[in-house]
Amino acid sequence: MKIGMFGLPLTGKTTIFSLLAGIPFDGSFKTEADEKISRIKDERLDTLAKIYNPLRVVYATLDFVDIPSFDMTADKKEKNKIFQMIQNVDALLLVIRAFRNDQVPFPLGNETPRQQLEALRTELIIRDMEVVENRILRLQEQKRKKKPTPEEEREEVLLGLIQKELEDGNFAS
């Protein structure tokens, strides 16, 4: 499973990523995603290995992706770059800053964990709305050219339901 770590600047994403991946924290600001595989130690598997003595023991793994910080003031092109990285993960881990440090300023206008969460939620919902609206438009254009397949008709109905949820400020899942 690939888990993307997503959050505003200076929230501690890379610090948490380093701890989960078992690598030293270098403190650098990244513009590209960093990916590491973390082996999940399981004592039950160790016990079974002692009992059955297999040729090798394969532990479960998690793939962590440290997505660059999401800058609320960035232009659309930069935001899209981050959203494309998000599309390549199976799950999102939102990292919200809940510590105070005078040396590390809060992201502009997002000084409480609730404000940070709402800002990220809003950005994700807006992005999902753009994707859904674009797909609905493409389906409607195709409908004018040729008769839609039953699958395309179901997709358009489903996208309409998803669009309604997003417009109400809810995630689709």
Regions found by a protein language model. Name each.
Residues 1-101, 108, 114:
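Conserved G1/Walker A P-loop phosphate-binding module
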Residues 52-58, 71-173:
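Conserved C-terminal guanine-recognition region of P-loop GTPase G domains, centered on the G4
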